[in-house]
C-alpha cells in the first residue's frame, strides 16, 4: 500500500483555500457596499459599512480580512456584522491591495487610508470617529497590529493612535516576521521540504524590511498604543508563539494586553465563529470592547 503524501499548508494558505462565501443579510442588517476610500477608485481599495439603524455616536469596528496578503475579500465576514451591530457598534469591513502587485508597507498604508475614511465619514453613518477598534484575522491580524503600533502609518494620513480604542488581532503568525521566517525555515529543513515559490521572505522582503514590518519592533512606552486582545488557536504552535511574543512586548511597554487561546478550533473556524452566540472567543472579544469603552 502506498502511503498518502502529507500536505503542509501555511496559516495564510488555509485561509485563502477555505475563504467563506458571503451569506444573505438578515432583514434587520443594513449595509452600504463598495465605498471608495482612495482615488482612483478600484475594488481593492473599497469598504463596506454596516450601520445600526437610527443610532448615533456608536463605537466602530474596522475589520481587516485575511488571505495571505494575496487573497480574501471584505465580504468574508460571516456572523460578525450582525453580532457587532446588535451590540451597538458600527461594523466596517475593508479591502486592500495584494502582494506582489504592491509592497507590504503599501498594504499597511491602505489600511491607514481606510481608517482615515472612517474617521472622516463614519459620523454620517452613526459612528464615533474617536472610538475606533482595529481588528483583523491572519494576514489582517498582522496589518491591524502593525498599524496600531507603528504610528507612522496613521500619521501619514493626518491621524494618531489616539483615535484607536483597541486592537484585536486574530490568529496572526507575523507580529515578529523574522521569528516566523526562521521558524518556518527550520521546520522545512527538518521535514525535507522545498522552499516555497512565494513565501514570507518574498512577501516581506529582506531582513531589515521584515523587522520594520513587525509590530513587536514598534512597541514602546508613551506612544499611545491602544489596549490589545490577541486571539489565537490554542493548538497552533506558530500563532500561539507569536501571540505571546506580541503580548510580552506590549506588557513590557505598559500597554494593557491579553491573550486568549481558543481550544477545540482551528485557524478558519476561529474567524468564522466570531460573532456566533456561545463562542468563547466572541465572549472574550465583547468583554474586551466593553472594558475598553469604559476608559
Predicted regions, residues:
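N-terminal cap/lid segment of alpha/beta-hydrolase-fold proteins
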Residues: 20-55
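Mobile cap/lid helix-loop segments that gate and shape the active-site cleft of serine hydrolases
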Residues: 21-25, 40, 178-221
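Catalytic nucleophile-loop/oxyanion-hole region of alpha/beta-hydrolase
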Residues: 36, 72-80, 92-130, 274-278
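C-terminal catalytic histidine-bearing segment of alpha/beta-hydrolase fold enzymes
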Residues: 48, 229-295
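Short beta-strand element of the alpha/beta-hydrolase
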Residues: 57-67
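A fold-wide structural signal in alpha/beta-hydrolase
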Residues: 60, 85-92, 97
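Primarily recognizes the serine-hydrolase "nucleophile elbow" in alpha/beta-hydrolase
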Residues: 116-183
Amino acid at each position: 500500500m502506498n502511503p498518502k503524501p502529507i500536505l503542509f499548508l501555511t496559516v495564510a494558505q488555509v485561509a485563502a483555500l477555505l475563504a467563506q462565501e458571503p451569506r444573505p443579510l438578515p432583514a434587520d442588517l443594513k449595509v452600504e457596499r463598495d465605498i471608495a476610500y482612495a482615488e482612483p477608485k478600484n475594488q481593492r481599495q473599497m469598504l463596506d459599512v454596516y450601520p445600526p439603524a437610527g443610532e448615533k455616536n456608536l463605537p466602530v469596528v474596522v475589520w481587516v480580512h485575511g488571505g495571505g496578503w494575496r487573497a480574501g475579500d471584505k465580504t468574508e465576514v460571516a456572523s460578525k456584522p450582525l453580532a457587532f451591530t446588535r451590540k451597538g457598534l458600527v461594523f466596517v469591513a475593508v479591502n486592500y491591495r495584494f502582494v506582489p502587485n504592491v509592497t507590504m508597507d503599501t498594504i499597511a498604508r491602505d489600511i491607514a487610508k481606510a481608517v482615515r475614511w472612517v474617521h472622516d465619514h463614519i459620523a454620517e453613518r452613526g459612528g464615533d470617529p474617536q472610538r475606533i477598534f482595529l481588528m483583523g484575522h491572519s494576514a489582517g491580524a498582522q496589518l491591524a497590529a502593525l498599524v496600531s503600533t507603528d504610528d507612522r502609518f496613521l500619521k501619514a494620513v493626518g491621524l494618531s493612535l489616539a483615535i484607536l480604542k483597541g486592537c484585536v488581532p486574530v490568529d496572526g503568525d507575523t507580529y515578529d516576521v523574522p521569528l516566523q521566517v526562521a521558524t518556518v525555515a527550520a521546520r522545512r529543513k527538518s521535514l525535507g521540504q522545498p522552499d516555497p515559490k512565494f513565501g514570507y521572505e518574498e512577501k516581506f522582503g529582506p531582513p531589515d524590511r521584515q523587522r520594520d514590518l513587525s509590530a513587536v519592533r514598534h512597541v514602546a512606552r508613551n506612544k499611545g498604543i491602544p489596549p490589545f486582545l490577541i486571539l489565537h488557536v490554542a493548538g497552533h504552535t506558530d500563532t500561539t508563539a507569536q501571540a505571546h511574543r506580541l503580548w510580552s512586548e506590549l506588557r513590557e511597554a505598559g500597554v494593557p494586553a491579553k491573550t486568549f487561546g481558543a481550544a477545540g478550533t482551528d485557524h478558519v473556524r476561529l474567524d468564522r465563529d466570531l460573532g456566533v452566540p456561545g463562542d468563547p472567543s466572541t465572549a472574550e472579544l465583547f468583554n474586551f470592547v466593553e472594558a475598553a469603552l469604559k476608559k
